[in-house]
Amino acid sequence: MKTTIPNLIGARWETPASVTQFVPIHNPSTGEVIGEVPLCGQVEVDAAVNAATRAFATWSVTPAPKRAACLFRYRELLEQNFEQLARLVTRENGKTLEEAKGDVRRGIEVVEFACGISHLAKGESLPQVADQIDAVTMREPIGVCAGITPYNFPAMVPMWMYPLAIACGNTFILKPSEKVPLTAVRLAELFQEAGLPEGVFNIVHGGREVVDALCTHPGIVAVSFVGSSRIAEHVYTLGSRHGKRVQAAGGAKNVLLVMPDAEPDPTLRAILGSAYGCAGQRCMAGSLLMGVGDQTADEWRERLGAALSEFKVDDTSANDRADMGPVIDGAAQKRVIGFVEGAPASGAEIAFDGRRLSPDRGFFVGPTLIDRVQPGTNLFEEEIFGPVLSMMRPKTLDEAIAMMNTHSYGNGASIFTSSGAAARQFTREIQCGMLGINVGVPAPMALFSFSGWNRSFFGDLHVQGLEGVMFYTRQKVVLSRWDKNYVRSQGW
């Protein structure tokens, strides 16, 4: 019997009677159908907005320390259920257990950051800003917020959004990816268990119709999105046109730049983790490797080929020791294999073909290395979102930086070097938002904002960190005078 995943509207978990379309949820490691999710629409979004609006009236005036206390309880429940959550992520997403634990851990870090809301949302004051005038700024919640999240991080990305939004005094509607709804449901159940009042956090499942309804609904004031650049731009444009605050994180083509003086062993570990972790399905995956100089490139082609030949690609729901799991579904598998099959026609060389490492069932593509990729080809321009590392051979650091800066994306880039001068030039000249020096995945922790540039981000204020607090609050400035003997002076 199939498990149908319910919506959360107010305090009620329910599958809407009016919904007639459902899509299957697969275990990517086996292809097994493990449930189905309803494709909801405007009616369900309206119900969620109504519940969130009612809850906002009381939650927005709940003292910040009380909101923080609920988040502290939530954080404790997340820790108690850590292993269960990680295995749920592995089951519906396919990443290895260790990667799933990292997914959950990074989400919990955002909850921990949000627990400090009593400090984070403090305003500013300046007594006697003018004669007998005191000035105070306050940060206040903005209203009903919405989040639209992808399949690649079922725990972390939703928790980039709703804990901080709710900590700031807002209410929230989450539309998780229809491919991975199980983790989101469990996260919401634990928040209820922590004592969160009904209607503060709601979940509506669905596809394009729900996305557009959230972006256009007059009762929603802000929309957060993570996904492809094509849909990020759509969400940003549609939401902005309807008067909403929007932060929309899109795709990426992150570069791993290896200098001749890079330390071999730590650099190898960093490249493998960056390019092939989570089967390459993350917006901070290293997907372009630039070995500066032919000798450097030749050495790294050999090192990587030897390491990849020992990779264990397996069913992550059954083998906790697998190095890599599947991609999310059959469509993703077909698309990634298409990039590999088309490589020779663009003049590139398949240096290591991971397709032969793939298990017979499930949606697998083994770790693959493609050398001599040229600018202007699809391997350079497009986000593959799979375990394929494209290798390029710039002659100098200057040439590498120039090549990187032609790209339309601007999420992350890393340099591996022992030279402080090279690292400094790299950090000064690269045009993207998150940089690593001898770090393979330069994704910031919750204390800092996730700062994509160019077509990797649409909006002004990023997720996480203080920018996240600013996104989910608005500023009020109060000028007050309480003097006994007021004499009008200079317009005051």
Where are the regions a protein language model picked out?
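Rossmann-like NAD(P) dinucleotide-binding subdomain of oxidoreductase/dehydrogenase enzymes
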Residues: 123-268, 303, 321, 394, ...
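Residue-level signal for inorganic ion chemistry
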Residues: 11, 31, 67, 89, ...
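Glycine-rich loop-to-alpha-helix module at the N-terminal edge of alpha/beta enzyme cores
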Residues: 32-121, 132
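A structural signal for short, well-ordered beta-strand elements
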Residues: 24, 38, 60-61, 93, ...
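Structural signal for hydrophobic packing residues in well-ordered secondary-structure cores
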Residues: 56, 60, 75-82, 86, ...
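ALDH superfamily catalytic-core signature
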Residues: 195, 230-374, 397, 437, ...
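Hydrophobic face of amphipathic alpha-helices that form TPR/SEL1-like repeat modules
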Residues: 1-29
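Conserved C-terminal structural/oligomerization subdomain of aldehyde/semialdehyde dehydrogenase
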Residues: 30-35, 196, 220, 257, ...
